[in-house]
Amino acid sequence: MSEPRQILVTSALPYANGSIHLGHMLEYIQTDMWVRFQKLRGNQCIYVCADDAHGSAIMLRAEKEGITPEQLIANVQAEHSSDFADFLVDFDNFHSTHSEENRELSSLIYSRLRDAGHIATRSVTQYFDPEKGMFLADRFIKGTCPKCAAEDQYGDNCEKCGATYAPTELKNPKSAISGATPVLRDSQHFFFKLPDFQAMLQQWTRSGTLQDAVANKLAEWLDSGLQEWDISRDAPYFGFEIPGEPGKYFYVWLDAPIGYMASFKNLCARRPELDFDAFWNKDSKAELYHFIGKDIVNFHALFWPAMLEGAGLRKPTAVNVHGYLTVNGAKMSKSRGTFIKARTYLDHLQPEYLRYYYAAKLGRGVDDLDLNLEDFVQKVNSDLVGKVVNIASRCAGFIHKGNDGVMVAGDAAPELTEAFLAAAPGIAEAYEARDFGRAMREIMALADRANAWIADKAPWSLAKQEGKQDEVQAICAQGINLFRQLMIFLKPVLPVLAADAEAFLNVAPLTWSDHLSRLENHKLNPFKPLMSRIEPARVEAMIAASKEDLLAAEGQAQAPVGNGELAKDPLSAEIEFDTFAAVDLRVALIVKAEAVPGADKLLQLTLDIGDEQRNVFSGIKSAYPDPSRLEGRLTMMVANLKPRKMRFGVSEGMVMAAGPGGEEIYLLSPDSGAKPGQRIK
């Protein structure tokens, strides 16, 4: 038998500035299932995480709430820890980046990089808020877009037209913190010489450490040449001061990944059998895996391995990247009630429902995962209650009534037993590859076979016949053994259901190797219902509660008269009819919709308006993260708008949408029956 593997696993650090939502939970559930599988197989697998507790946003929120940053992050950590525990995410340690371990390790890694010549210094010019006495990050500057003149836009990009620009290009800039007009000032900053590691990163990113799609994306950065990375921020800033540089602080993204090491070091101090150096030294034989979302790939697959290499430490075995979560085919929306906090979900539904649904839909790629709430109800009820738990509930009563709860010996269906044994390696392989969806499909296929076999044997009918009691007991004992096999396979996903099943089965905690054995002449405990169906009304109540969360956050129970959309966005000045008539509005069919490479907000739409097609760029990507879902839909467009040349091509019109922007954008559609090219009047 091979030696148990030594594995250290991390999930991305949640920011200590807000609540956990179901989009976050996708990653932690994915990681937890993989860790539980490794432990079930007998491997030493350590799972650590921490709150990401530094940065200007935390400093400013604490100031707004009238508490210290330390108090804020302690409050948030308590909330996060409770949410994770109740979702059955079983960290070996959940720490904080605001810790002595992280301070020491950040200083150590920085000092090694500096001494090796990988740190540069130079002056940079930035906007400075004279009232707050602080330099402003791009997102803390607002003004008028230099391209389309839209007001109240951020300092790095326009949410209306999708343009990107430098903060110094913004017209009429204002501090989003104080409202003051910022001034330009120079400051010395510290830079990590990422280009020093170009060759290493080109090799490492193609060495099997990343999914192909991720490696291909990073190749674009590598091929265009890496840039030095600004790793410093000026006081006031909540974080760690750079050694020997008063008033200069590490940028949050320098010490955040080091927080993985710090959390593990904190754990090592409490578990003497763990050796920190054995996991982090350059020649470490242990495995190291990071689970992250695709929005932070650059930090984990370029900056982080380069920092580790420069500091003489080991690099990750692999970085496993997942996509975003959508709900009902669209980006999570506060107004629609689909921006669901972890606690709001837990107030209404069992955590294992969502764990199973995520598992059933998670592949090993980076595609987005859609939580379709109607499908969620149907799938959980059908698979877990209707298939898996149904086997135990069908068989247990006959064993208790007919044989005092004792399972008879013998194998009533050798071909089924063999099929379950033969499926185990493939299921294990799918778990190992993080292809949870394939694992669930194979497990449910086995459940279908077991249910079909029991239905064919119909022990409920045999029990009514004279002299058939031995056959009934053999059938039901086989059914319980098959149920036990399924619970072993599902244990990484459904730990509470597995524990309840173990109590019913009257067995010690199941391990993966237990699938090779059977229960014979074995006494069962009385059967209790193991899982109830999801009631659609509870999902509806969760959505309603999520909308109430939004209202509470905005400090309002209901939107009073005079505080509706017109109050937020007053009517424009009156125009003459002829002015309106000059605008040619047409029905348009969206033939093709796709993201624009290099543009965070834009989608490129190909529109059919009857006798011709138009190319239109629209800043609606934030509300429609899966643009393919727009294809085949009718919308409305301004057809006689003068074509406008943009950085990505020529836009030949404008589609009509409502909403304040960001994720709250709603593309307008005509009633059914309208045809492409018809005038809107």
UniProtKB/Swiss-Prot annotation:
Subunit note: Homodimer.
Gene: metG
A Pfam family it matches: Anticodon_3
Family the entry assigns: Belongs to the class-I aminoacyl-tRNA synthetase family. MetG type 1 subfamily.
Record key words, sorted: Aminoacyl-tRNA synthetase, ATP-binding, Cytoplasm, Ligase, Metal-binding, Nucleotide-binding, Protein biosynthesis, RNA-binding, tRNA-binding, Zinc
Protein location: Cytoplasm
Binding site for Zn(2+): C145, C148, C158, C161
Any single GO BP term: methionyl-tRNA aminoacylation
Name used for this protein in its record: Methionine--tRNA ligase
Broad class of the protein's primary localization: cytoplasm
Motif 'HIGH' region mapped to chain: 14-24
UniProt binding sites for ATP: K334
The organism of origin for this protein: Pseudomonas putida (strain W619)
Residues covered by the tRNA-binding domain: 579-681
HAMAP family to which the protein is assigned, alphabetical: Met_tRNA_synth_type1 (MF_00098)
